A protein has these predicted regions:
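Nucleic-acid substrate recognition interfaces
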Residues: 1-386
């Protein structure tokens, strides 16, 4: 029997406390948990076993076993992230290196320095994390509860004491995943069949926000490479996704591009919105054509360096995020049951520009997408021509 495909969904909401005393109790707990995470990280660097770290964290910071487990889990995640990116784990700055470097500048003063110090304290001391478990109504320490059609988050602050905060969040659109979470919570309350959900509390600009993450069952893959693929070049010139449709035998059927210009100078939220719209357009195209998606295995995209004489190009490359767009396409494809094929990017730009672009009268951005297609057919046997 095949295992069900699952995807993790993370949802954000704001918390409103009933009294200032409850809010201060949670802030004090967040400061202790943040310190416990840093302590656990240092002990892991020293080579201490996880079980011993967990016991020492619980005893030293007055946290229950589940909070201590959460601090250890966070510390392990930070350590593994450094190792995956080939970074020195001893140089991690809790609170953010960019803020740390800004605060080191002696010429900052007044309101600007006060804002940076507040942001530094919030990022360094404003964290609380509890891993979900199915046996304890989904989560032992941070648990949503209903009362008179209102949703509250029950927070364990230690010594068998709990405080409650009202969850402030409304569904923003018709298919908002927040409605899915509320439906699953209501069903679990009625049937007693709970599901694990992980809750993270963070302090941002004086407000406490909760991030609730849980797993969602995905539909089986129904759109496969058997009917052909749509090759996507995420870093086509000039910084837009280009696509080319191929038949099962590899012949070109159609091609085009998804306009994504004017990204430079935009705020991060607006850039993310445009990237999501582009990803939805790719998925809409794949569903309409009934074909799988072929993507390049992108790593280490050059963005230029200071002194190369092209500051304008460096600025554009710095604000263009093909990896972010790739991740969004993968997320949406999993939800829609569309297969995503990875191919090696070696020489696709050269082959596309020198062979397929003149042969099929394609542009410089669309040619490499045509070069992706001869390679996906061999991935059926786990092979690659390049």
């Amino acid at each position: 029997m095949k295992k069900r495909r699952k995807a993790t969904i993370a949802l954000q909401c704001r918390l409103r406390f009933e009294t200032q005393e409850d809010r201060e109790a949670v802030l004090y707990l967040m400061r202790r948990f943040s310190s416990a995470t840093r302590f656990a990280y240092q002990r892991l660097l020293e080579g201490m076993e996880g079980r011993e770290v967990r016991q020492r964290v619980a005893a030293l910071f007055g946290l229950n076993d589940r909070y201590a487990h959460g601090a250890l889990t966070k510390a392990k995640a930070i350590l593994s992230s450094c190792q995956e990116r080939d970074q020195n784990p001893k140089k991690v700055v809790f609170g953010g290196r960019r803020l740390f470097e800004q605060l080191k500048r002696r010429h900052l003063s007044g309101k600007r320095r006060a804002e940076l110090k507040r942001a530094w304290r919030e990022r360094r001391q404003g964290l609380l994390f509890a891993v979900g478990e199915k046996g304890n109504r989904g989560n032992q320490n941070l648990r949503p509860e209903w009362e008179e059609s209102r949703l509250f988050l029950r927070i364990s602050v230690g010594h068998r004491r709990w405080v409650r905060a009202e969850v402030i969040r409304k569904a923003k659109r018709e298919k908002d995943r927040w409605d899915l979470l509320l439906a699953r919570l209501a069903r679990a309350e009625a049937t007693g069949e709970w599901f694990p959900y992980t809750v993270t509390l963070r302090l941002r600009e004086g407000q406490i926000y909760a991030f609730i993450s849980f797993e969602e069952d995905l539909p089986p893959v129904s759109v496969t490479r058997d009917r052909g693929v749509i090759g996507i070049d995420l870093n086509a010139f000039p910084h837009h996704p280009a696509w080319a449709e191929a038949s099962p035998d590899g012949n070109l059927l159609a091609h085009g591009a998804i306009p994504l210009t004017g990204m430079e100078g935009l705020r991060k939220a607006e850039r993310e919105r445009r990237l999501w719209l582009a990803a939805y357009e790719v998925i809409r195209l794949a569903k309409a054509k009934g074909k799988a998606i072929a993507l390049e295995r992108l790593k280490g995209i050059p963005r230029g360096q200071r002194g190369d004489g092209r500051p304008g190009l460096r600025r554009k490359l710095g604000q263009w995020a093909p990896r972010s767009l790739e991740e969004k396409i993968r997320i949406l494809a999993r939800r829609e049951g569309i297969e995503v094929v990875e191919v090696s990017p070696a020489y696709t730009s050269i082959i596309g520009s020198l062979k397929y672009a003149p042969q099929f009268l394609l542009g410089a951005g669309v040619g490499p997408t045509r070069a992706l297609e001869p390679f996906w057919r061999d991935t059926r046997q786990g092979e690659s021509r390049i």
